[in-house]
Amino acid sequence: MKLTCVVIVAVLFLTACQLATADISGGMRKHRALRSTTKLSRSPFDCSSPGAFCGLVPCCDSCNVLGRCGSGLHV
């Protein structure tokens, strides 16, 4: 009897945790969708030139170990 009660409480607790997590992640999906549309709307020429720092605007070529766009040791 005690084991049955413990199992029922555990199942209810895990179900409540999953429902709470689903509520929290629902808002993040909206932001992810917005982020993906802004990436798609970016023009292919919207990139940093060689020698610029790798950061918010992606490098046209690649980012090297020193954190700069262009040739050299790549990450």
Curated annotation (Swiss-Prot):
It comes from the Eukaryota. One of its GO terms (cellular component) is extracellular region. Residues 1-22 form the signal peptide. The keyword Disulfide bond applies. Its main location: secreted. Residues 23-42, 70-75 form a propeptide. The keyword Transmembrane helix does not apply. Keywords: Amidation, Disulfide bond, Knottin, Neurotoxin, Secreted, Signal, Toxin. Pfam families: Conotoxin. Disulfide bonds join C47-C60, C54-C63, C59-C69. It is found in: Secreted. The modification Cysteine amide is found at C69. One of its GO terms (molecular function) is ion channel inhibitor activity. Expressed by the venom duct. InterPro entries: Conotoxin (IPR004214). Belongs to the conotoxin O1 superfamily. The presence of a 'disulfide through disulfide knot' structurally defines this protein as a knottin. This is Conotoxin Leo-O3.
